[in-house]
């Protein structure tokens, strides 16, 4: 029996803001009602105090030049080095460069108002990691789609870093309701997410992000048409095994299987000889085998067996519901990282089935 883990942005520590009606309420409930500022970085260095007049004169001279002595340490400003900090508690968040431009938490909500309509977002979860080094907001779009009568909900996720470790990322992702599979798909040439670095032009880029993503009724309808196309493509069990293998194995690994007289089916059925001869890792073999099992027995799979839609959901279902990463790591990986790319690649390969 497979367990449905739920949406990747719903995890222990994330704040449920589904009862909030306005952006202001969300910020307050999720603890995002703080601002971030940039400050100069100061270096702390030890000094040896011998008590001589020469040393006292030197320290006085250094203080006049901007240094600060406290106890047995001297503090000097670091040229062209900056840090970000929370202005409410004066907590440092990270080291950044001189051209780093801050994106306040409030800008995330302005984006939702621009993309969906003021006070039209159906808020889901929000929160921050650590002291506020990274924040996120998720909201459900008001328009759902149906794939052969199978409901799929559309979501927007906005993430931002305040510590210099990354930029702003805005993700459009559908979630299949029955199994909570995350369906990250780049529809034709339209990406499902955009990212911006913290440069001086970032605010202008965020303001037009909804145009870049095509986040609108058109985007949702386009995805629905694409999924219904997959639902009408008939596939065999052999097709699905090949599809899963091509998604999860490298071209070199597939070639080694052929060179040693084995097939992806041998790996899916956990053949020890195929594993040894092809030098494919046991971890990959387990993922392929478990994904193939999920194709038949995963939540919501029975009604879509024998279709490309079912094959895609086997991949997304494995990473959404079986893979053992949790919490913020699961959020990052499924929405933006390696797991996201696997799911997106599954959609790209499915059209060729």
Listing of model-derived features with the role each one plays in the protein:
Residues 108, 133-135, 152:
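Residues at beta-strand starts and edge strands
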Residues 1-63, 127, 143-353:
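Intrinsically disordered, low-complexity regions enriched in serine/threonine
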Residues 58, 68-73, 80:
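N-terminal intrinsically disordered, low-complexity, charge-rich
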Residues 98-122:
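Amphipathic alpha-helical segments
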Residues 74-99:
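A short, surface-exposed helix-loop junction/capping segment
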Residues 88, 117, 163-164:
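Short, solvent-exposed coil/turn segments at beta-strand boundaries
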Residues 124-144:
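Beta-rich nucleic-acid/ligand-interaction surfaces
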